A protein has these predicted regions:
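Cap/insert and terminal regions of metallo-dependent hydrolase folds
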Residues: 189-275
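Compositionally biased, low-complexity flexible segments
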Residues: 1-18
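Acidic/polar short surface loop at catalytic or gating sites that assists cofactor/ion binding
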Residues: 101-141
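Active-site neighborhood of phospho(di)ester-bond hydrolases with catalytic His/Asp-centered motifs
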Residues: 56-60, 77-84, 115, 183-186, ...
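Divalent metal-coordination and catalytic microenvironments
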Residues: 27, 46, 58, 67, ...
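Conserved beta-strand hairpin/beta-sheet module of binuclear metal-dependent hydrolase folds
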Residues: 19-71, 170-186, 203
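Catalytic core of the metallo-beta-lactamase
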Residues: 144-200
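Active-site metal-binding motif and surrounding structural segment of the metallo-beta-lactamase
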Residues: 61-113
Length: 277
């Protein structure tokens, strides 16, 4: 069965606000680039929304502007950060300003779920420029650190985590609700723990930072499209979405490389793409 995929709006929100979502769970790609944002692609960010509990997985460089086309920041249920590399969390800073000074105010603080040790790292970063100190974050965010070995429940959704093979502690995330599932690899080299987390997922968002045949010096912390396809095949997922790829890679090359390995639906991520789950 072909994946149900469509493009979101490119000209900003409708006059009355962001698009009204139905009860169908949807995955919206707000950022698909690797560490360098491009004119047409922000860094990593993904909105999973079942119409009741919109959850953002990562909020990388430039992604907030895209995200606002699909969900106002005052209605977000939570932000979950996979690891503390800037291209996965840095737009928490402009989000803080939006929550503090924007026209749409929340009635409660926004829960932000960070990996272990993430709170101290974020506060250290903020201390370099914010005179408010710790209050810069705590006045709008409810900062929490998840336990990667435990199940995180956010309203009706459940999230599970797995360690990945990356340069710093990083965690893949599996979102589930009412039989629908999305697994996000975060940044990782091929890893059996990620495969197990992704087992039989409806959608497997997997990074494809490296080009086929490209090697990293020292420890390997990223994957190729072939690696992603092999993990998708091993996990038995329905759809593979290749993401977190750089400007050197083309959609055609990524698709062709993965299609030699994985027989299911393959989508090369680009910003504003919306998938029904």
């Amino acid at each position: 069965m072909a994946a149900r995929v469509r493009r979101g709006p490119r000209q900003g929100r409708a006059r009355g606000g962001p698009i009204a979502l139905t009860a169908t769970a949807r995955l919206t790609i707000a950022g698909s680039s690797a560490s360098i944002p491009r004119p047409d692609r922000a860094c990593s960010s993904y909105l999973v929304d079942d119409g009741e509990t919109p959850i953002v997985l990562d909020l990388g460089t430039g992604a907030l502007a895209n995200l606002r086309r699909y969900a106002d920041y005052d209605r977000l249920s939570a932000v979950v950060i996979s690891h503390m590399h800037a291209d996965h969390f840095i737009d928490l800073i402009p989000l803080r300003y939006a929550l503090r000074y924007g026209s749409r105010r929340r009635t409660s603080k926004l829960p932000v779920h960070l990996p272990p040790g993430g709170t101290a790292m974020l506060r250290t970063l903020v201390s370099a420029f914010a005179s408010e100190g710790g209050e810069f974050l705590s006045d709008v965010f409810d900062l929490r650190e998840y336990d990667p070995s435990a199940v995180l429940r956010i309203d009706g959704a459940t999230l599970r985590f797995a360690h990945t093979a990356h340069y710093i502690p990083a965690f893949a995330v599996r979102w589930e609700r009412d039989g629908a599932s999305v697994t996000y690899s975060a940044d990782t080299a091929p890893d059996e723990r990620v495969v197990e987390l992704a087992r039989e997922s409806d959608v497997f968002l997997c990074e494809a930072t490296l080009r086929h045949g490209e090697c990293e010096a020292g420890m390997r912390g990223h994957s190729t499209a072939v690696d992603a396809a092999e993990m998708a095949r091993a996990a038995g997922v329905r759809r593979l979405v290749l993401t977190h790829y750089g400007e050197e890679s083309t959609a055609m090359d990524l698709d062709e490389s993965a299609r030699e390995i994985f027989a299911g639906d393959i989508i090369v991520a680009d910003d504003h793409r919306v998938l029904d789950l």
